[in-house]
Amino acid sequence: MVINMKGDFINYCGLLGIVAFLSYTAAVVFSPLAYPGYNWMAQAVSDLSAANAPSLRLWNQLSCLYNVSTLVCAMMVCAGIQGKGSRILRLGIYLFTAMEWVSAVGFSMFPLSDSGYAGTFQDQMHIFSTIIVVLLSIISLVLIIIAGIKDKEYRLYGAFAGIALGMM
């Protein structure tokens, strides 16, 4: 029996997407407990990780695996899709990975300075990062949906991309 180490490694690293999901979900669910008066219907999730948020420490602890796991997972998907799939599918995946990098770097470098929007340069860069992340998310997911519509081999990718886009 021969084990494909490269393929197995890529597949196992792909499972870090689940770790990222659980880490981010824990941060979103439990960080409000450390933020008196936080209203999830009226406030952005970014308020939980603002530079002066009372929940910042808990947010950082719970989300510590999110960025690294997301980036490794996305990069492994890029490595695994090379030379495979349609051009539209690959472009969608590459743009989604670019979005993950912009998210990881942009939001780490420029957390909100204060809950809400204080209008500082840091806040402006946070908003700019958000705009880029949202645009890349929409474009990449639409491309993956199109790939799923055009080729039934990628229909499941398209369906999950549609669900993700709908949840946005």
What does each model-found stretch correspond to?
Residues 65-92, 139-149:
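Internal transmembrane alpha-helix with an interfacial aromatic "cap," most often the third helix
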Residues 103-146:
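Membrane-proximal helix-loop-helix units in multi-pass membrane proteins
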Residues 99-106, 164-168:
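Aromatic-anchored segments of alpha-helical transmembrane domains
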Residues 39-54, 114-123:
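Membrane-interface interhelical loops and short amphipathic "cap" helices
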Residues 48-68:
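Interfacial helix-start motif at the membrane-water boundary
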Residues 10-17, 85-98, 154-163:
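Interfacial segments of alpha-helical transmembrane regions
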Residues 21-39:
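Alpha-helical transmembrane segments of multi-pass membrane proteins
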Residues 1-12:
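Short, Lys/Arg-rich, polar N-terminal cytosolic tail immediately upstream
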